């Protein structure tokens, strides 16, 4: 095979590199690249564009690293070692991590709602106790005290409703603006989503290695990964922008967003189960 430097001089590399980027982008549109999980994750945490980019890049980095590890590992371990033989094991590992992530998302949302309800219950109890003490120390006549009590109760009820609404809105904002999800958790989820190898990229790299054209193979794999990153980042950013726009234009979005993490965690869990079953069946063959 022609050396990469020669291809550069001939101008052929400028055809290979864009082609590899385009193939990577198209490859990212194929099923099985965690696009559904990434979109569900971004929607669940109401992630920002920065977090969406981070998620897509993390998935691409792990995807590229797996290609290199399998290619070189396969050459060291056995000539019969292929991407097809390693894929079921990686699917099984990814399934375990993905299901764990789905469970964590579900538990985090459920715990947050319980804590909020308990805090509101304690606030209501303390408010009623304070109201009782206020009545006890009144020095007015009975009729006036009764009227004052009625008016005060009505005002407190309105104040409580306003406080309840504000607390609920702040809780939704706190839970779904991404602040509770650390960058490390986003990176971990992205790295997990990119563990499934691409047999085509591994095959190209192996051919280039065997033909002693490592630089060319590395360049093609990196270009392929750039195209894949463009697709995954676009999916994540699209989900993030959609959430932000819907939240601005639809007042009822917060009500829906309160339940979104449950649906997202369920969807992610189902994808993880599917990957686990598929990987297990591949191992048993």
From Swiss-Prot:
One of its GO terms (molecular function) is nickel cation transmembrane transporter activity. Residues 127-164 are annotated as: Disordered. Residues 32-56, 108-185, 242-262 are cytoplasmic. Residues 135-146, 153-164 have a biased composition (Basic and acidic residues). Residues 1-10, 78-86, 207-220, 284-285 are periplasmic. It comes from the Bacteria. Induction: By nickel and cobalt. Transcriptionally repressed by RcnR. GO terms for biological process: cobalt ion transport; response to cobalt ion; response to nickel cation. The chain crosses the membrane at residues 11-31, 57-77, 87-107, 186-206, 221-241, 263-283. The keyword NADP does not apply. InterPro entries: Ni/Co_transpt_high_affinity, NiCoT_RcnA. Keywords: Cell inner membrane, Cell membrane, Cobalt, Cobalt transport, Ion transport, Membrane, Nickel, Nickel transport, Transmembrane, Transmembrane helix, Transport. It is found in: Cell inner membrane. One of its GO terms (cellular component) is plasma membrane. It is a multi-pass membrane protein. Pfam families: NicO. NCBIfam families: PRK10019.1. Belongs to the NiCoT transporter (TC 2.A.52) family. RcnA subfamily. Efflux system for nickel and cobalt. This is Nickel/cobalt efflux system RcnA. It comes from Shigella dysenteriae serotype 1 (strain Sd197). The lineage of its organism: Bacteria, Pseudomonadati, Pseudomonadota, Gammaproteobacteria, Enterobacterales.
């Amino acid at each position: 095979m022609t050396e990469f430097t020669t291809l550069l001089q001939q101008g052929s590399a400028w055809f290979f590199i864009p082609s590899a980027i385009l193939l990577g982008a198209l490859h990212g549109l194929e099923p099985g690249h965690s696009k559904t999980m990434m979109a569900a994750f971004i929607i669940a945490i109401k992630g920002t564009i920065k977090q969406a980019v981070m998620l897509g890049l993390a998935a691409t980095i792990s995807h590229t690293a797996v290609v290199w590890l399998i290619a070189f590992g396969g050459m060291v371990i056995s000539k019969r070692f292929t991407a097809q033989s390693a894929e079921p094991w990686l699917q099984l590992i990814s399934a375990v991590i993905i299901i764990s992530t789905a469970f964590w998302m579900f538990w985090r949302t459920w715990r947050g709602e319980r804590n909020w309800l308990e805090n509101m219950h304690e606030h209501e109890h303390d408010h009623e106790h304070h109201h009782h003490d206020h009545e006890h120390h009144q020095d007015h006549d009975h009729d006036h005290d009764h009227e004052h009590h009625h008016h005060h109760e009505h005002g407190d009820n309105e104040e409580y409703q306003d406080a309840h609404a504000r607390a609920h809105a702040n809780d939704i904002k706190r839970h779904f603006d991404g602040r509770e999800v650390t960058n490390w958790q986003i990176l971990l989820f992205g790295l997990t989503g990119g563990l499934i190898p691409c047999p085509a990229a591994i095959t190209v790299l192996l051919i280039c290695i065997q033909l002693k054209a490592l630089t060319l193979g590395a360049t093609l794999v990196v270009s392929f990964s750039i195209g894949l990153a463009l697709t995954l980042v676009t999916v994540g950013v699209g989900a993030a922008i959609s959430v932000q726009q819907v939240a601005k234009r639809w007042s009822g979005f917060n009500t829906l967003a309160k339940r979104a993490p449950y649906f997202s965690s369920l969807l992610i869990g189902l994808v993880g189960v599917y990957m686990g079953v598929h990987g297990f069946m591949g191992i048993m063959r």
